[in-house]
Structure formats: structure tokens, C-alpha cells
């Protein structure tokens, strides 16, 4: 049996703006995504039996990841890819029945509901790996289109590099940014994303910045956030989830030493503080260890993934 193990990374949003509402009822966003070295691990094993009329994969995880297996983005990704192949005459029904069953084992490390995109990353990794194992030959653009139908954060993990994201998150433009390190805190809070979008205090009319400004003025949103940049969900989540407010307060107490701006990532519960890699504000390892020990929530030290990282070279 052939077995391939693939890392599935998390992401953070350096800022997150809503720039208006679309005619389809969704919101237009503008954000900058960074991929980080916090991973789930997926192992794809090609079994010695055909799928027949069953689902093309079987998912195994050491920890339950959704109440219903069919709600998991790994399962949804496999189902969507198979449907795309069938609808575009890449497979006949007879060929589909002869495809080998793929066993997918998920080792879950990325916290769920954190705004780190763990489920979306798993879905993206599944699309890319099954595209290879089934020899479909789809390109990144096609896989991103399938991914966008599964969730707004899925395409960035197929894109595989730092990017400006617009639309609902599916319009991606590469951006070159310096390496960064972060202290992440994960409060124990469940955030209902749909409720956030409906919240009366949510800012929905942010300025849309052109790409030239974002590329040339990255100092306004990387280590610090200038007044023009924010995560619009942050004040709403703080008000709804006291544990998130506590975590942000803790990071703000550290920011006097780092000179950086703590913030929320995505629309989840995870917050982070950029850590200077060089200079007088560089935080030594023993101090970082103390900060983690004193943190009011589980914590992680992570770094950004370099463009072209081997962890994303699936094609």
C-alpha cells in the first residue's frame, strides 16, 4: 500500500476588513494571509480495494473533528473533487467505481474554532493530494475554484504563499513580506461566525486599499497596526467572549516590551502578538518561555512559512 504524509499548515490574518456587502448577501473582504508553521498532519494511504459505490475516502482521526463525518471539510473536499471529475468527463462512472479507496488519517494539532483555518487547510490538502493520487491533472486555479465552493479560506492553502485576499477570500494576489514570529494564545471560547456577521456593531464599510499601498506600506500592518488597519471582528469578539478579552489584555501588557500590536486572527478566538526577530526588542527564548508559562490560555510560538516551503510543494 502506498502511504504519503502531508503537513497541513495554519494561517493568520494580519488585518481583516469588510469593504461592503455583495448582491448575493455575502460580504466583500480585504485581508492579508500568512501561512505559519503550526500543522495538522494528514496521511493518505491507497488501499487495495476499489471504492465501488461508496465514498472515495475513509477518514480516521484520533480526535473527533466534527459531529457528523460528512460535515468535515476533508470529506467534503473529496466528494467535491470527485463530482468535478465526473461532471467534466474526467472519469466515467465505471472508472470511478474502480478508483482505489483512500484512507486518510488526520493528526489534529491546529485548535478548532480559532480563526487559524485548520479545517480549510485540511480540505485544501485533501484536494491537492487526491488530484495527484487520482492523476486528474487539475491546476491550482481549478482547485481553488473547487476549494472556494467549500469555504472562503480554502483557496489560500492551495495558493500556498502569503497573499492579499479579496472578494469572499477567493481572489488572491501574492505579496512579499518579511519573516515573522508570533506568540499565539487560544482562549477556550466558541465563536459563532454567522452571529458576528450579523452583529449591529460590526464595521462593514472599511476603506479598500490598492495593492501598491499594501505592498509598499507593509510596516502599517505587519508588526504594528496603524490606525487605518484592524480586524473588524476583534471588538465584537472581545465583547462576546471575556476569555478572548483577557488574552488580548495579557498580550497588550507584553506589547510594551515588543513594540508590536496584538490582534485577533480571522473570526475565531485566537489572538497573537508579533515578536521582533532582531534588534533591541528581540525577545530571548527564556523570556518567551516565561511569557508562555504565565499566559492565561494555551499558547504557541510560531513562525511564518517561507515562499516555496517544501511543506506546500504537493504539485
For the regions a language model picked out, list residue spans one by one.
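Hydrophobic C-terminal alpha-helix "anchor/cap" residues
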Residues: 33-36, 147, 251, 291-292
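Short, basic/glycine-rich phosphate-binding loops at helix/coil junctions
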Residues: 51-67, 126, 148, 220-231
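Glycine/serine-rich anion-binding loops at beta->alpha junctions
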Residues: 105-134, 152, 261-275
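ATP-binding N-lobe of GHMP and related small-molecule kinases
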Residues: 1-114, 132, 136-141, 186-188
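Short beta-strand scaffold segments in enzyme catalytic cores
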Residues: 40-44, 153-157, 163, 271-273
Amino acid at each position: 500500500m502506498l502511504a504519503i504524509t502531508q503537513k497541513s499548515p495554519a494561517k493568520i490574518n494580519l488585518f481583516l476588513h469588510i469593504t461592503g456587502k455583495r448582491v448575493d448577501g455575502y460580504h466583500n473582504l480585504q485581508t492579508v494571509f500568512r501561512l505559519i508553521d503550526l500543522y495538522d498532519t494528514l496521511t493518505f494511504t491507497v488501499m487495495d480495494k476499489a471504492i465501488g459505490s461508496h465514498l472515495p475516502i475513509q477518514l480516521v482521526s484520533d480526535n473527533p473533528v466534527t459531529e457528523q463525518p460528512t460535515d468535515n471539510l476533508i470529506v467534503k473536499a473529496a466528494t467535491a473533487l470527485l463530482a468535478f471529475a465526473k461532471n467534466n468527463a474526467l472519469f466515467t462512472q465505471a472508472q470511478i467505481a474502480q478508483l482505489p479507496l483512500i484512507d486518510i488519517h488526520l493528526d489534529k494539532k491546529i485548535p478548532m474554532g480559532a480563526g487559524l483555518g485548520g479545517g480549510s487547510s485540511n480540505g485544501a490538502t485533501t484536494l491537492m493530494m487526491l488530484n495527484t493520487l487520482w492523476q486528474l491533472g487539475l491546476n491550482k486555479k481549478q482547485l481553488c475554484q473547487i476549494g472556494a465552493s467549500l469555504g472562503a479560506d480554502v483557496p489560500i492553502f492551495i495558493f500556498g504563499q502569503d497573499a492579499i485576499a479579496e472578494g469572499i477570500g477567493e481572489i488572491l494576489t501574492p505579496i512579499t513580506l518579511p519573516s515573522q514570529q508570533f506568540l499565539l494564545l487560544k482562549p477556550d471560547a466558541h465563536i459563532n461566525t454567522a452571529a458576528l456577521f450579523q452583529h449591529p456593531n460590526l464595521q462593514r464599510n472599511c476603506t479598500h486599499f490598492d495593492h501598491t499601498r499594501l505592498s509598499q506600506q507593509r510596516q502599517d500592518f505587519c508588526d504594528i497596526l496603524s490606525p487605518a488597519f484592524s480586524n473588524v471582528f476583534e471588538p465584537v469578539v472581545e465583547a462576546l467572549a471575556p476569555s478572548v478579552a483577557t488574552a488580548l489584555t495579557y498580550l497588550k501588557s507584553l506589547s510594551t516590551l515588543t513594540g508590536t500590536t496584538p490582534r485577533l486572527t480571522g473570526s475565531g478566538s485566537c489572538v497573537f502578538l508579533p515578536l521582533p526577530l532582531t534588534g533591541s526588542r528581540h525577545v530571548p527564548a527564556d523570556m518567551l518561555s516565561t511569557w508562555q508559562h504565565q499566559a492565561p490560555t494555551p499558547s504557541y510560538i510560531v513562525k511564518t512559512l517561507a515562499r516555496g516551503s517544501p511543506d506546500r510543494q504537493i504539485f
